[in-house]
Amino acid sequence: DNFIVDLATMPHLLMAGATGQGKSVGLNAILVSLLYKKHPSQLKFVLVDPKKVELSLYRVIEKHFLAKLPGEEESIITDTKKVVYTLNALCIEMDNRYDLLKEAGCRNIKEYNEKFTARKLNPEKGHQYLPFIVLVVDEFADLIMTAGKEVEMPIARLAQLARAIGIHLIIATQRPSVNIITGTIKANFPARIAFKVSSKIDSRTILDAGGAEQLIGKGDMLVSYNGEITRLQCAFVDTPEVDAVCEFIGNQKGYPQAFLLPEYVDEKEMEGRDFDA
């Protein structure tokens, strides 16, 4: 029996589990299923990978499915400072999209894109087809430890406001402790996945219920969605398979470059510079 949920209805997903219990495999399963379903014009990924190696396989589909900051070489973000810039750029993208929706008189991205494809919106006024953007963060705890509030604020903003304009967040973390998954973040991530965690407290933090500490491991998971908790076995997508899928997509003709996010200028850094020099 397959369990399939639309990410757009979720609208954001929080995953937690101890090391080696299938979190990264679960992420890969989600990413690959999205790659299968959507055309590059409909979907872009922003991949944040503090571990540096987990998501590097997706580098070959940069010109098809990835989004990045202007002027960056790497489309997969591993550096904490760049993560902060990217999150803020996503917030700018969100505000821009809301302006477009307001102009078009639409309430969500689906209505907007339907209107646009029906040629009811003028591209000369800046209207364009808006792809879904999925932000994937593979080790959230690491970001919070190194950047703290700077990361948490934009993520909380995106989680609160970005669902209507097609920006969705998938966040994975090893340590679901209270100082990492704060109340603000929990409130905005109604869909949660827990792989095996080390203690009952961790299970309560992520699912608001015990049970995740008794899972077997190896992709055995609890999904909390719509107020119900379901026990599932996560599909196993190994590295060669992800590689093959990415390779296949990468060999097709893509766009000239990755999807560019708006430019973000850090005001604090601007103050430090002297423009006359």
Residue map of PLM features:
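Short secondary-structure junctions and interdomain/linker hinges
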Residues: 97, 119, 213, 252-259
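Short glycine-rich substrate-engagement loop in P-loop NTPases that contacts/grips substrate
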Residues: 106-117
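Residues that form generic nucleotide/phosphate-binding pockets
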Residues: 93, 115, 206, 245-248
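Short, P/G- and charge-enriched loop/turn segments at secondary-structure junctions
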Residues: 120-124
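Conserved alpha/beta core segments of nucleic-acid transaction machinery
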Residues: 225-277
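P-loop NTPase catalytic phosphate-binding loop
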Residues: 1-107, 125, 130-197, 201-215, ...
